[in-house]
């Protein structure tokens, strides 16, 4: 009898815990073949200045609040990148336009780099130095920089010193985007938004407003290879002998005739597209993680999902209260977006443990 009451008490406590859980996402697709690990992201939805971890039911299971001063108004919406470090079970996050921070499970944190323009993406080297993007800077400013572990800038790269004009990289059917970039002039000229490191030590640097990403030799800063023709490129990530990336392709020259054709692209080693996944079914993917099972974990403006290399959706969770098929409706979906950073709500999510 005593065991019955113990079990009943445990069951009631579990039900109350579930009932009181804060839910960020609603899960619409799940599959026995999916990666069942939890998901971490900077909270750009609720208005709370924090990093959160959610389970695959979309419920918050851990959170960490940014200290006062790290987030200024809606700066959190300016490219809050995140990485998970499995060996230390910690998170490295960007407080956009403030710093790159390592956050531990016990709530302690360490600032790894500080810069008033840091955002989007970063790479932490073994010696503690940090390579990071400076996404919204104007022509002539550093688009990427490295700070050593003491906070001193030891390397930088300016797009305009190596790439003289954007127009030679344009010419797609997506005239509306190219027109918007041109109208800004020198403001937000290159829009650095992605970083990865090749096995040979060279850097892969992504420039959205060039619709291209570049392999750069770090000692000289010289561009040794160009990967062009990927409209509004986001998150070019090494995959097999090539890359997986998100593009923002479309047709049309203004809002009235623009048709979204955005997709996840798989390329070969030369950047030639071999496959397009989810074409026309998403709006602005800004996070792609290659998972240990060979699938892709994708973050769009309203959704986190796992897809296999053929584009089959194995897991899909959407911001609570949002239509799960809304993004396939293209720009007509934008007025219906809700959340702190609408319409570009989610930035990047990653799998944890």
Where are these regions (language model features)?
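Bacterial N-terminal signal peptides
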Residues: 5-15
């Amino acid at each position: 009898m005593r065991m019955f009451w113990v079990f009943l008490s445990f069951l009631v406590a579990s039900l109350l815990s579930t009932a009181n859980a804060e839910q960020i996402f609603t899960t619409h697709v799940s599959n026995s073949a999916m990666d069942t690990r939890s998901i971490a992201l900077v909270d750009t939805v609720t208005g709370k200045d924090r990093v959160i971890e959610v389970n695959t039911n979309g419920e918050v299971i851990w959170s960490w609040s940014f200290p006062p001063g790290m987030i200024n108004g809606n700066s959190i919406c300016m490219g809050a990148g995140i990485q998970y470090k499995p060996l230390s079970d910690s998170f490295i996050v960007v407080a956009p336009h403030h710093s790159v921070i390592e956050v531990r499970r016990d709530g302690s944190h360490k600032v790894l780099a500080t810069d008033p323009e840091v955002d989007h993406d970063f790479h932490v080297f073994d010696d503690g130095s940090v390579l990071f993007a400076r996404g919204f800077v104007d022509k002539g400013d550093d688009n990427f920089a490295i700070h050593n572990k003491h906070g001193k800038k030891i390397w930088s790269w300016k797009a305009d010193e190596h790439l003289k004009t954007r127009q030679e990289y344009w010419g797609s059917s997506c005239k509306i985007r190219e027109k918007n970039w041109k109208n800004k002039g020198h403001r937000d000229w290159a829009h650095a938004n992605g970083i990865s490191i090749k096995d040979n030590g060279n850097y892969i640097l992504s420039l959205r407003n060039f619709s291209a990403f570049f392999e750069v030799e770090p000692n000289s800063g010289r561009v040794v290879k160009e990967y062009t023709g990927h409209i509004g490129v986001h998150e070019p990530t090494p995959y097999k002998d090539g890359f997986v990336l998100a593009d923002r392709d479309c047709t049309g020259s203004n809002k009235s005739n623009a048709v979204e054709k955005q997709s996840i692209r798989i390329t070969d080693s030369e950047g030639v597209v071999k496959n397009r996944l989810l074409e026309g079914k998403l709006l602005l993917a800004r996070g792609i993680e290659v998972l240990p099972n060979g699938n892709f974990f994708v973050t769009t403006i309203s959704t986190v999902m796992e897809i296999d290399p053929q584009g089959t959706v194995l897991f899909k969770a959407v911001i609570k209260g949002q239509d799960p098929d809304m993004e396939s409706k293209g720009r007509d979906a934008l007025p219906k977006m809700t959340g702190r950073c609408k319409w570009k709500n989610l930035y990047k999510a990653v799998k944890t443990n």
